[in-house]
Amino acid sequence: MYKRQKLANTYDVPVTVRSGGTSLAGGAIPVCGGIVLLMERLNKIIELNAEGMYMEVEAGVRTVDIQKYANEAGFLYAGDPCSAESCLIGGNIATNAGGNKAVRYGVTRDQVYAVEVVTPTGEIVELGARLKKKSTGYCLEQLIMGSEGTLGIITKATLKLQPIPPYRFDLLAVFSDPEQALDVVPKIMQAGINPTSVEYMDNSYVRGTADYLEFKGAPHYENGIYVIITVETFSEDELDLKMEQLDELCSAAGAVDVLEADERIWDMRRNCQESVRLISLVSLTDDVVVPVNEIAGTIKFIMKIGEKYPFPVKINAHIGDGNLHIVLCKCELSDEEWENKVEAFHKEVYTYAYSIGGRLAGEHGIGAKKLREMETYTPAGELAIMRTIKAAMDPQLILNPGKIFDL
């Protein structure tokens, strides 16, 4: 691989790395032509070290296979994107993927000790180390994470493992009022419950996913808004205490029902994106992130402005960490009206989110999709430093060109 990259650099040939192809931002599309580098054959789990609590894997291993391998050895790999069945770990690192467990364990960069990278000029470098802390200059492994294949080709990764909490409960709090559903979240976070997941589905998603999965007994199908909460602990007494707290908090906030969330409820959450095809073959998914204390206001804002647009607006969210997924459905709109209205809608949402300290993407990345918006909704000084780094590491500008920003 490094020899191919040296040749590409010598002859100024663009190279785009394609991992699992699950990007929702066009990150793996070769917009400038050239070579597309497929990673699926780099699929070996090299080592699991139980004493050191780490795994070393190649970049083409499916995330779900890493999770299963760790679980079989009695450990947890905490990275858990909803596309785990099909995405690859290299792509997770390149986009700094999040997922359902990020509220407790953090995003992908929090699960990685080190990476092996082929640089744009064709050198093989190892960045990072299996250390809980270090103070030895720039943290270059973190620079690669979230760079979307523009600064280097990730070939291997050393991943952190966690002990598996033996006690777990999944709770479903159902609300009829979206404001009540949203306002309960800061109370949960302030109570010290430290949930593993806090997920939100508006009623259009409750009905849509239940229909898609043919789940006829979905609780409060007609008007329910779901807040799904997972709590994991290392003692049964602690779990009982936290579940009692959650029940009281949700009931006091106005929940019409508080029950156990079985696997069918999680299937609904995981199939939000797929369920959209029941009403529209064309849809667009967005991925803004805002400060956690602003998420209720942001969803209320989106619901309000959505009323004036001619397409359905559906919202699911990792509300525990401020990350919203807004899905717009084309349905029967003409191409021209769809494109014009979508652009206007996104401008309103991005402007609002940026004004309260938010950013364009929480876990999907910028890719080619939001390249233009990156100029408007990112601080100028931040962009300038990014461009300087890109030019220094990739002087020929051949690695995944046309992504994140223009040079």
Describe every region a protein language model picked out.
Residues 123, 371-407:
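Activity-critical C-terminal alpha-helical subdomain
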Residues 9, 27-43, 71-75, 99-109, ...:
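A glycine- and small-aliphatic-rich helix-loop capping segment at beta-alpha/alpha-beta transitions
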Residues 44-199, 399:
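FAD-binding subdomain of flavoenzyme oxidoreductases
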Residues 354-366, 391, 395-399:
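Alpha-helix capping/hinge segments and adjacent helical runs
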Residues 3-42, 318, 353:
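Glycine-rich N-terminal segment of FAD-binding domains in flavoprotein oxidoreductases
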Residues 163, 174, 182-348, 352, ...:
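C-terminal substrate-recognition/cap domain of FAD-linked oxidoreductases
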